[in-house]
Amino acid sequence: MIKRVHLGQGRADEILDLPNLIEIQLNSYEKFLQLDKLKSKKPLLNEGLESVFRNIFPIKSGNGDVALEYERYYIENDALNFTEKECKRKGQSYEAVLKVRLNLQFLTTGEIRQKDVYMGTIPLMTERGTFIINGAERVVVSQIHRSPGVVFYKEKDLYSARIIPYRGSWLEFEIDSKKDYLYVKIDRKKRILITLFLRALGFDTREKIIETFYNIKKIKVEDGTKRDLPGQYLAKSINIRENMYYRAGDKITLQDVEDFLQNGVNEIELVDFDGYNDISGKRFVSSNVILNCLEKEDAFFALKDGSKELPKESVMLAVYGSLFPGEPISIDNAENDLKTIFFSERRYDLGRVGRYKLSKKFGFDDLTTSVLTMDDIVNTISHLLRIYEGHDILDDIDHLGNRRVRSVGELLTNIYKGAMSRVEKIAKDRMSNKEVFNLKPQELISVKPIVSAVKEFFATSQLSQFMDQVNPLAELTHKRRLNALGPGGLSRDRAGFEVRDVHYTHYGRMCPIETPEGPNIGLIVSLATYSRVNDYGFLETPYRKVVNGVVTDQLEYLSAIDEEKKCIAQANAAFNSNGKYLEDLVSVRISGDYTTTSPTNIDYMDVSPRQLISVSSALIPFLEHNDANRALMGSNMQRQAVPLLFPKPPIVGTGMESVVAKDSGVVVKAKRSGEVILATSSKIVVKPFEAENAKDLDEYHIVKYERTNQDTCFNQSVLVKEGQKVERGEIIADGPATRYGELALGNNLLLGVIPWNGFNYEDAILISDRIVKEDLYTSIHIKEFSIEVRETKLGPEKVTGDIPNVSEKILNKLDENGIIRIGTYVKPGDILVGKVTPKSEGDITPEFRLLTSIFGEKAKDVKNNSLKVPHGTEGTVIDVQRITKEDVGNLSPGVEEILKVYVAKKRKLKEGDKMAGRHGNKGVVAKILPVEDMPYLADGTPLDICLNPLGVPSRMNIGQLMESQLGLAGKYLGESYNVPVFESATNEQIQEKLKTAGFNPTSKEILYDGYTGEPFENEVMVGVIYMLKLHHLVDDKMHARSTGPYSLVSQQPLGGKAQFGGQRLGEMEVWALEAYGAAHTLQELLTVKSDDMSGRVKIYENIVKGVPTNVSGIPESFNVLMQELRGLGLDLSIYDDAGNQVPLTEKEEELINKS
């Protein structure tokens, strides 16, 4: 390990160590599968896969005679066909068999038949938090989606409340503020008046509705109160006699008051709009929206004579008709249907989260009921009305209390739920069969829906992604990513600015910096360093508890909901050894506001300054001195750094380098403390101190030169020697892009910030050829080429070195089986695997047919279908793999074997490669200068790299300058530094180090021109900067074509390197050539080099013959245009200067020749 000097303003030690950075994946999958509990035979919790089975079973037959009951499930780990390594090599999935113990119970006879039923295979997660599917490592990204529960919001003039379940119908309430009416919508269908909806749910009288929402006051009817009563609303109906009935909700008139007095009504109950009940302490509604809705009912329904309430039939017709238009209605069925939509566990599920959110909102303790209750509906309506009245506030949809995370375990649980409901349906159908008494449990279960659903999820789901494996940081970040897209999430086109924007609740939970540039900005984000997901799926972040102004060591994890209105101090607030704050006023944040307050008001304190950013951003030293846009680019570009052959850790680090290396899974860590008894390049054997016997040894296999998903090289190197003692968790072998157990993505280079003859104009980079000679930025890239050997209708294909019409020189590189030898250097067009395919009879010439009939099968002609090295690829063959049916057992139909050839290429840094620092300072290598021509320091040390000073002021990423200054001191003092984010070294500390190293405190030095030896006019800033080589290499982009494939319709060359295409000459390029007057160049570009079919054949002929040429015919695109115009019914013909018709098609040519 490297000894680092802590240099910064804060404390070197932190109260809380960083958690395992991939625990979001590991914990979620463990909750889903409960493998640890299965191994230790402990009872399983009702979550994940166990909850799916418990919810579906028992499955009962229609008549109730037969029941299929669930006991438990097993994962057959011993039955794993292949190890992780073999799965990758053979293109298989790393999965185990899932079996479920079922009891088939015959209730009439009491007989029970038990069986362990096969339920398909289930992919297993590797220790690194990945899955291996068809030989490729994949990651299931966590999804951030709208939380189930209730949310209140406003759109234009509509105040809305929405109850979102985990599964089931959406219920929306909306108040039309122009008309003062409240409506309800179920599943976004037609609006229903709220009073009708309430009546359908059982509030069948006006009185019930009014007393549910309004406070009621009793008033004595006397001459004195006579004037105050008109205009008020009755809360209870008054029935004086047959023709004198006053309904609840009716407005009282002066005449009504007179009638009350005359008929001896001494006391009446009225609606009290005060909205607060002094006795119960309960808040009621204070607007007349509900009363308006009761009035509106009367306008819709003409009541029958003498009826005092709406008949049930009318209510059900109105409600059910809006929900299911055109369906015949039976009143009882309609009532049941309406209730099952929300109150049946089969059709509706709020989920644990939905119930938690509702209870939290309305102050209940109930956390078990999974369906809606009448109280939920009433409370939602009351709360919405209070918001409308201005007594309560709207919800913030982008608040992290209203968004939750679905990790891999929950996503898979949902997949299994959907598949098992189909299995249940099939089982019930089979139970209805007359022969049910002869059945066994396994005959009732159909595995197909489960197998196909799981396969589809891992292979095609938007959230199951091919792992980004460029370097360890890219892997780690991919596993910690949160995605708002995907099934049940947002769509790129409809996501507005608000959803993408940074919100104050993201603090300590989601990184405000790391997100892609482009259409996904803000929709794909990263977890903050200390963040974790709680049981309900909400993101939590840790805080230190502050009691009476004293900081304690007690830690609490708070979700965004818990944190609301709490007073939180920053991590760098100064306090003494007793935990008392040193200042009278401390900077704090309360919800989204930043202010200062007295220490006694503080509730919590941040645990670390890097708490609010992601792992990638926390690797950028002096982050606080960079503009946010450049920090974003720096975070993203570190993930694109190619692992180098000889990387070095940065001189100026942040302390996160070792954590990332440890948790990324690319290094080898000791499982137990012990002594190394064997250390070779491919294997380490450790004898543990607590070994029970001589055979109890820990073996570690070292990975050598394997290909990653992105064609970079995965290579581990041993760090320990035989006889060395190692501790548990110690790193004993480095992986790609790690050195001495620290992340090492690039190298430290001596930098001069100086323009140099225009070669570093516009972000271009000038480098010394010392970098190339010493292989500082040399990387290995491994490509895989594969070919299938099939059984065809005409006979099997063969792998052979006996290939027709191929020169001996090319075949020399193949072995006796026709496969390239390992160690051979191959170039484009070389054969890697010789393969011949039988030709069909139609392809055979008459002479061959004669030979076949004389000599039989021996003379059968074959076609050369060999695997060749594609254009633009060369390198050394490092491995060949042959996978046969015997090896795997389930190759695709018709495939006999698969051959894979791995070609490795050492790529040195060259002009056109992209490089970048950690501060978003990216550029392309424009020139590699001989070391003797580079500017040099007074002691003769030549610079390694020259960057343009104009790249700093407008980009505002000053961090790169501070890093360079401290790096310079570190290089000459032989020190490495930890400069934590947001607590980085001050200018004074850097200058002190520079002075100690013998440099000018400004780090400006006199530089000498490498050409002339003369000093430059001004002093130049010199430093040591950490630069990375990015995965945008010129070798992958450079491309040339002479002839190649053409598009079928337009006959123009295809586009792009992958299609071996041409270079597009667009509209503006044509203008440029026109403006220049290059008529002949333009003509040949638009005709013979593009789509003039006859012209290009002639010109090729003439070039071969060496004859000067100037031919051009009609471009094919002109013919396409002509045919389109003819398709519109326009008869067009073309004539040349002599007046002869020019044929456009072969048919036309025949007709012209005939005439």
From Swiss-Prot:
Transmembrane ranges, per UniProt, are none
- Kindly name one Pfam family recorded for this protein: RNA_pol_Rpb2_6
Q: What does this protein do?
A: DNA-dependent RNA polymerase catalyzes the transcription of DNA into RNA using the four ribonucleoside triphosphates as substrates.
Q: Which HAMAP family match?
A: RNApol_bact_RpoB
Q: What's the protein name? A: DNA-directed RNA polymerase subunit beta
One GO cellular-component annotation of the UniProt record comes to:
DNA-directed RNA polymerase complex
What family name appears in the similarity comment?
Belongs to the RNA polymerase beta chain family.
| SUPFAM superfamilies in the cross-refs | beta and beta-prime subunits of DNA dependent RNA-polymerase
Name the reaction it catalyses.
RNA(n) + a ribonucleoside 5'-triphosphate = RNA(n+1) + diphosphate
Gene (UniProt): rpoB
Q: Which PROSITE patterns match?
A: RNA_POL_BETA (PS01166)
- List UniProt keywords, sorted A-Z: DNA-directed RNA polymerase, Nucleotidyltransferase, Transcription, Transferase
Oligomer status and interactors = The RNAP catalytic core consists of 2 alpha, 1 beta, 1 beta' and 1 omega subunit. When a sigma factor is associated with the core the holoenzyme is formed, which can initiate transcription.
User: Which GO MF term does the entry hold, naming one?
Assistant: DNA binding
**What EC numbers are recorded for this enzyme?**
2.7.7.6
Instruction: Tell me one GO biological process term.
Output: DNA-templated transcription
